[in-house]
Amino acid sequence: MSNDINEAIEQIEISYEYMLAYAAQGRATDQGDHPSPVREYLDKMHSSCDLLLSSLEYDKKFKNEYFIDAVISDIKVSRSLLALALRMKDISSQIVDNLNASVHLRAMLTDLFVLEDVLKIET
């Protein structure tokens, strides 16, 4: 499996795990006396989505694959959701909980688990 794809998937998984923990904290904001690194994790996830998109859209071995088309679509929607959250002045636990519950984000994660397994088998 391409190192770039592998690293991007790994970063998305790490970020999602942090998002689950942040959502449970009940915070009204990521700012204040004890700022949270949630914004950093969301930004890393967003950047990883960019990397995956460029890898999947331009790699010839993924051309004409309906599954990859769906993966790309799910990544684009998830990336857009992350961008919306990153534009917010305050990122609350509730916002992150809603991101976690998004069918688009969950679909992307499931797609990436499948893609990761398929690419491991091919190498």
Go through the PLM ranges and name each one:
Residues S48-D69, M88:
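Short, solvent-exposed, charged loop/turn and helix-capping segments
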Residues I12, M45, I75, L105-L109:
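Alpha-helical transition-metal enzyme core signature, strongest for iron centers
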Residues A70-S80:
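Short, well-ordered alpha-helical segments
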Residues G32-R39, D69, I95-V103:
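Short, charged, amphipathic alpha-helical segments
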Residues M1-R39, D111:
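Short terminal alpha-helical segments
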Residues Y22, G26, L52-S55, D59, ...:
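Hydrophobic stripe of amphipathic alpha-helices that form coiled-coil interfaces
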Residues L82-T123:
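Amphipathic alpha-helical binding modules
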